């Protein structure tokens, strides 16, 4: 794709790839996730970091949203992104203000921070701050 050519031609530029590399309504949301796997090929460039939003970004909001996460089935996008980028190139982003109408800011934050996927070692620390600090040139 043209974007991958841009990544190839700009190795000194840091890229923050938004929304788990998903675009609303695209085939990346449908099993077997071939479109998403193709988008994750951007991870081969070490100057890329993926921003991960709350689950409300990829799941339909229930009619009445309680505190916590009411979703039973969550597509494997977070796991696939972690396998491709590793936690040191993943950073949480609230997607505020749209998250307020989806899962709410608190759920967008805690849903990623407390995800079992990020409970090993300092994975959550990387996703919730260290990766962003490193990407933007702060000491980690």
Range-by-range predicted roles:
Residues 55-57, 96-99:
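Short Gly/Pro-enriched loop/turn and capping motifs at secondary-structure junctions
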Residues 79-91, 100-140:
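Mid-to-C-terminal alpha-helical segments outside catalytic/metal-binding sites
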Residues 19, 50, 95, 124, ...:
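Divalent metal-coordination and catalytic microenvironments
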């Amino acid at each position: 794709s043209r974007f991958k050519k841009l990544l190839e031609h700009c190795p000194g530029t840091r890229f923050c790839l938004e929304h788990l590399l998903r675009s609303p309504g695209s085939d990346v949301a449908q099993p077997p996730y071939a479109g998403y796997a193709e988008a994750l090929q951007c991870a081969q460039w070490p100057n890329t970091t993926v921003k991960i939003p709350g689950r409300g970004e990829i799941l339909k909001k229930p009619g009445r949203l309680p505190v916590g996460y009411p979703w039973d089935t969550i597509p494997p996008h977070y796991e696939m992104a972690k396998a491709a980028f590793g936690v040191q190139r993943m950073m949480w982003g609230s997607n505020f203000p749209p998250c307020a109408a989806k899962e709410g800011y608190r759920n967008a934050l805690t849903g990623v921070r407390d995800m079992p996927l990020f409970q090993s070692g300092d994975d959550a620390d990387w996703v919730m701050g260290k990766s962003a600090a490193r990407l933007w040139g702060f000491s980690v």
